C-alpha cells in the first residue's frame, strides 16, 4: 500500500533537503511511500503579490491556507498512481498546528497526522514561553547556570545605561524602536508575513514572565509592546481588542487545546517552550508523546 507522507508547510521557505532524511523519510521508504513538501501561501516562492502591503495580505489566513492543501491533495489524487493512496500529514511547530487543523477541517482527505511541537492554542499574553526557557536553564544547568545569566544581565544593563548617556557623542547602530518596526514593514519578508498572522490569528506574543526568572529585566516586553507593532506595521485598527478577538476566533473554530481529531500523534518535549500551548491535547483518539530531557 502506498502511503503519501506529506510534509506540511509552515512560516518558512521549503527546501528539498527536508525530504532526504529523518524519521519521515525512513517511514516513507519502509512503506514504499511518496513524500511531498508543500509551501504555505505568502512564504518562499508561493506569493500572490509582488509586495506585502496590508491590503495584499488579506488572503493570508488559516482557512485559505488549509484550503490550498485540500486542493493540492485532490489534484494529486487525480493521478492514477495516487488515487487509492492514504495520506499522512507531518508538521512541526506552526506546521504541526496546520496538520491537526487540516485533519479536523478535511477528515475525508487524510488518514492520519503526526504533529510535533505544535502550539495549537492561540494566546496573546504568552508568558509561558520564557517561563519554560527559564525552567529549561534551571533543569539543564542548575542554579549555577541561572546565576551566570543573571550576572551577565547586570553589566549589560550598566553598559546600556552608559551608552544611553553618551548617545549624542558618537554614531551608533540604528537599534531604535523605529528600526524594529521597519523590520516588519518591509514589503517582501517572511518576518512581515508571520507577524501579520500573529496579529490577526494566533497571538503567540512572548511577554515577560513572572518575577523571579532570568528574564526579570524584560519588564517592557508586554502585550502593549507587541500590539503597538501590529498597529504601526499594518493598521491602526489592529489594536488590542482586535488581536484578542482574532485569536479567540481561531481557538473557537479549531477547539484550542481539544481539537476534534483522530488518528493523530502529538509530540512535545518538556523543555520546548511551545509545549505550554499544546500538551493538554492528550484526549480521545489522540496519541500524545511526551519527551523528557535527559538529566
Q: Which residues fall in each region the model found?
A:
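N-terminal cap/lid subdomain of alpha/beta-hydrolase-fold enzymes
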Residues: 1-70, 74-79, 240-263, 273, ...
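Structural recognition of the beta-strand scaffold that forms the well-ordered cores
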Residues: 4-7, 34-38, 88-90, 112-115, ...
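Conserved beta-strand elements of beta-rich interaction domains across eukaryotes
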Residues: 11-13, 41-43, 94-95, 120-121, ...
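Short, structured coil segments at secondary-structure junctions
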Residues: 31, 106-109
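Alpha/beta-hydrolase fold nucleophile elbow
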Residues: 81-93, 98
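Active-site signature of alpha/beta-hydrolase-fold catalytic machinery across serine-
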Residues: 101-105
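A catalytic-pocket lid/entrance helix-loop region that shapes and gates access to the active site
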Residues: 108-153
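C-terminal subdomain of alpha/beta-hydrolase-fold enzymes, centered on the catalytic histidine
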Residues: 151-295
Amino acid at each position: 500500500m502506498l502511503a503519501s507522507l506529506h510534509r506540511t508547510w509552515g512560516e518558512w521557505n521549503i527546501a528539498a533537503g527536508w525530504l532526504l532524511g529523518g524519521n519521515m523519510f525512513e517511514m516513507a521508504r519502509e512503506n514504499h511511500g511518496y513524500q511531498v513538501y508543500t509551501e504555505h501561501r505568502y512564504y518562499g516562492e508561493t506569493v500572490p503579490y509582488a509586495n506585502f502591503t496590508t491590503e495584499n495580505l488579506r488572503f493570508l489566513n488559516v482557512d485559505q491556507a488549509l484550503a490550498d492543501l485540500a486542493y493540492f491533495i485532490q489534484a494529486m489524487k487525480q493521478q492514477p498512481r495516487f488515487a487509492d493512496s492514504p495520506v499522512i500529514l507531518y508538521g512541526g511547530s506552526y506546521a504541526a498546528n496546520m496538520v491537526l487543523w487540516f485533519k479536523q477541517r478535511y477528515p475525508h482527505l487524510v488518514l492520519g497526522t503526526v504533529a510535533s511541537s505544535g502550539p495549537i492554542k492561540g494566546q496573546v499574553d504568552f508568558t509561558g514561553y520564557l517561563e519554560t526557557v527559564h525552567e529549561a536553564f534551571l533543569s539543564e544547568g542548575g542554579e549555577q547556570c541561572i546565576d551566570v545569566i543573571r550576572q551577565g544581565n547586570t553589566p549589560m544593563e550598566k553598559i546600556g545605561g552608559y551608552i544611553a548617556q553618551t548617545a549624542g557623542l558618537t554614531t551608533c547602530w540604528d537599534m531604535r524602536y523605529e528600526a524594529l518596526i521597519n523590520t516588519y514593514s518591509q514589503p517582501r519578508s517572511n518576518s512581515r508575513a508571520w507577524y501579520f498572522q500573529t496579529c490577526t490569528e494566533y497571538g503567540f506574543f512572548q511577554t515577560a514572565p513572572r518575577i523571579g526568572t532570568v528574564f526579570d529585566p524584560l519588564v517592557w516586553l508586554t502585550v502593549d509592546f507587541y500590539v503597538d507593532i501590529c498597529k504601526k506595521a499594518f493598521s491602526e485598527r489592529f489594536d488590542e481588542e482586535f488581536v484578542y478577538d482574532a485569536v479567540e476566533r481561531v481557538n473557537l473554530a479549531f477547539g484550542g487545546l481539544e481539537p476534534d481529531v483522530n488518528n493523530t500523534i502529538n509530540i512535545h518535549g518538556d523543555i520546548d517552550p511551545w509545549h505550554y500551548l499544546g500538551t493538554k491535547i492528550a484526549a480521545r483518539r489522540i496519541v500524545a508523546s511526551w519527551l523528557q530531557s535527559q538529566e
